[in-house]
Amino acid sequence: MLRAACIVIWLASPSIGQDFYTLKGHGGPIMDIAVSPLGEISTASFDNAVGFWGTDGPVWLEGHRAAVNTVCFLNNKIIASGADDFTLWVWSLESASGRMVAAHTAKIADVAIAPDGQTLATASWDNKIGLTHIEGLDGSVESWLVDDMILLSGHRAGVNAIAFTQDGQTLYSASMDGTIRSWNLNDPKAPSTVIVKHGFGVNRLIVNDADGWLAYGAADGGTRMVDLNTGETIADFTLGRRPVLSMAYDPVTKMLAIGDGQGYIMFIDTTVRRITTDFKASLTGPIWALSYSPDGEYIHAGGIEDIVYSWPVAVMDKHIPMVGGIQSFLEDPISLPNGERQFKRKCSICHSLTKSSARKAGPSLYGLFGRKAGTVVDYTYSDTLSGSSIVWSEESVNALFDLGPDHFIPGTKMPMQRIVKKHDRDDLIDYLGTNTVQEEN
């Protein structure tokens, strides 16, 4: 479950002041970034893995069966992650092992650790918030004592974000139902209190109870600070860019960072409630992940690329934006033959055509035709495909996209998508037939 690889590329050491650097190695977009008190970085990716970026390069924590959406440090030695497979995993960096400790009935969008260092909160698209208490984290993974998850109900749509107060007595949650709620954790069965009624879905949430405010970002681009007790707006930083997808706060500098769907990172000085920098960080897509270094000098960001970018905050407007190259699924479709276009738009984000699966969310398609499903050696399959009798052929690939993966292979973790037009399926199959042929020895 824990595998090391030396494929990180540093443009500059993070110890050198005011230098920009990147972390490379994931096989899919970066969905979340967390930073330990020591400054070490963990990442959640569309490639189904959690990355831990230590001094010797990346270590991959593998156990999730779908895209990982969220990650957090419980301490310098323990990481938690939540994913599209509905599960919450906790990982020990010391023992090189992990364990699934709880599960929702829909994707987990956010995870947060309480000040006690033992209680994890999870935000899920099943409209619920989960509280999972774990004791014995200083022992082996097998010896951890995990309580049954307590579920908090009240939201009428999926929950996107959660945050504890510093005393751990209150939890705040943001939902697609357009509300932000507070929960009294001394009485989990008590009804929640609606603090904000935004209307549009609220995606991200930062709580600063020491200064008496919370900040949130919404699907319509709404970006506001509100009074923590009354919910009254005390500052509005909405610029019309939507949606807001990521937020990070640094308690040292009191700077708030907001990432959006148009590739900008906006910085706000919360002491004077003023925008200080508005940086076009990505030329090709959204900013899904943001996190500060412990001293507040660096902002780490992730998006549609499989790279983490780290900029020095003080001079980041003098640095270049994300320039990792155009991802294959973003290439101009007009410039491509139809079969290649279908592959790059529908398949390339998850699958490679090389011998290696290249750390992507799905197995390599090299040697696809004539191969039994579930047999690529460098990929971890779901139980559904591990024992499948399907042999990939023109007929089975056609059926896969005609019916949709969820109907052709019930229980698969493949995305639910169809290629409706027969000529598009035919062109894709022709393209795969030409580009997945194994080389003769």
Task: Annotate each language-model stretch with its function.
Residues 315-342:
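Electrostatic cytochrome c docking/interface patches
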Residues 359, 363-415, 428, 432:
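Extracytoplasmic electron-transfer domains, predominantly the class I c-type cytochrome c fold
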Residues 44-47, 81-85, 123-126, 174-177, ...:
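Conserved strand-to-loop turn within each blade of WD40 beta-propeller repeats
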Residues 41-42, 79, 120, 171, ...:
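Hydrophobic beta-strand positions that form the internal "hydrophobic ladder"
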